[in-house]
Design a protein with these regions (language model features):
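A cross-taxon signal for low-complexity, glycine/charged-rich
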Residues: 5, 15-18, 24, 28-32, ...
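Intrinsically disordered, low-complexity polyampholyte segments enriched for Lys and acidic residues
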Residues: 2, 28, 40-43, 47-48
């Protein structure tokens, strides 16, 4: 099956329902500045085309207070994601003393920016899956209000967990928040697209298995290949290698989590134009840049408590082990992103660290920290989902 490198968000969403991609290699598409409307779309899709240039967006923003709130909440969630989730990418690099905390945070900010911007242009199918996961109904005004509630619930839950230094899964929070709001506005589970919802859960579970297995396998291979290398020379090499691995992990964090929230913001823009679907439209460049910058700013704030929890408390790592964990995590995220599977970057990285620790001995893993993290992830679905449900009901009564 051949597919274009840059796929339209709507093309994927429309064709995913039929279990296939819509693709015509070599097809020409007219260029219109920051937004391109693909011509090879299913019949009737172009009727939903809307102007998503920055000028049009600014005009909509000025006259629509609900859109202002939606955009503010979305950017707030992206910022919090950079603050709370991105430190996972550099935790091992800091705890093995390859880089100082602030150096690592600034490096992560740069590569998170590049990950969001570059990967969304290459393959935006992760954003598609997220935007297609729930149905807020035909009333786009109410849908926009419910989306506001979902986003606020994610911020509240994530900030609360971060204050106590508990690693959070923004992917879990996003799914729970959107689902709670959709159930509230539809009055039941009819607002949930279970085909997409279950696919996302499969991806989250897969991240655990792939992360652990790849971490264990890569570390085992490195241990065998480097067993005759002098320790000082190995440490010099793995210091550089781990910095590169942390940069790659940061890039893939931006690619995965950035796309998820771009998909949500894109859906909010569609609601503000009276459309309940984003089928047939590509993500504009200005939107990619905006989300990239905000995630980079959130990352620059840093989350030193989370770095300590993930990198120091879970497993005591040496430099080669930190490199193996970063390489395994980045590889799993790349695989998932290329196939459009939204996964938890937190799950992937922490399970890779556990896999690396298991090579030496199972007792090297601090199971108390692992247990706390698993309980946090388990509570995210009902906790964040309930907050979103209640907020959606309140918001719809107010507006």
């Amino acid at each position: 099956m051949e597919t274009r490198g840059i796929s339209a968000l709507g093309c994927f969403a429309a064709s995913a329902r039929q279990g296939r991609f819509v693709s015509r290699p070599g097809a020409q598409r007219p260029h219109c500045g920051l937004l391109c409307a693909p011509m090879d779309l299913p019949k009737g899709v172009l009727n939903n085309f809307m102007d998503l240039s920055f000028t049009s967006f600014w005009g909509q923003l000025v006259g629509n207070p609900i859109l202002i709130i939606t955009v503010a909440f979305t950017l707030g969630v992206i910022f919090v994601n950079g603050w709370t989730d991105a430190p996972n990418a550099i935790a091992t690099c800091v705890t093995t003393r390859c880089l100082g905390v602030r150096q690592a945070i600034w490096m992560s900010a740069l590569f998170n920016f590049l990950g969001v911007f570059v990967m969304t242009q290459i393959n935006s199918s992760v954003a598609s899956t997220i935007s297609n996961m729930v149905d807020f109904g035909a009333d786009t005004s109410s849908a926009l209000i419910a989306l506001c509630a979902a986003l606020l619930s994610i911020v509240v839950y994530s900030v609360g967990a971060s204050i106590f230094g508990i690693p959070t899964s923004e992917s879990h929070s996003l799914i729970a928040g959107l689902s709670g709001a959709a159930i509230a506005i539809q009055g039941g589970v009819g607002g949930i697209n279970f085909n997409e919802w279950v696919k996302v859960l499969y991806g989250l579970a897969l991240s655990l298995l792939l992360g652990f297995a790849s971490g264990w396998l890569i570390c085992k291979l490195v241990t065998i290949l480097c067993r005759n290398i002098e320790l000082r020379a190995a440490n010099r090499f793995f210091r550089v290698a781990q910095i590169a691995g942390a940069a790659g992990m940061s890039f893939m964090h931006g690619a995965q989590d950035g796309q998820k929230f771009i998909g949500v913001l894109f859906l909010g823009l569609a609601f503000s134009h009276g459309q309940n679907s984003v089928a047939g439209m590509e993500i504009p460049v200005w939107l990619m840049l905006l989300c990239s910058v905000v995630m980079a700013l959130g990352t620059s704030v840093g989350g030193e408590k989370i770095i300590k929890s993930v990198g120091m408390d879970m497993v005591k790592l040496e430099r080669y082990q930190g490199f193996c964990a970063d390489l395994a995590g980045a590889a799993c995220l790349l695989f998932s992103s290329l196939f459009g599977i939204p996964v938890s970057t937190t799950h992937t990285k922490t399970s890779a660290i556990m896999g690396v620790g298991a090579v030496k001995r199972l007792s090297a893993i601090n199971y108390g920290v692992v247990k706390d993290m698993m309980l946090t992830w388990i509570f995210t679905f009902p906790g964040c989902g309930l907050i979103s449900f209640v907020m959606a009901k309140i918001f719809m009564q107010i507006w």
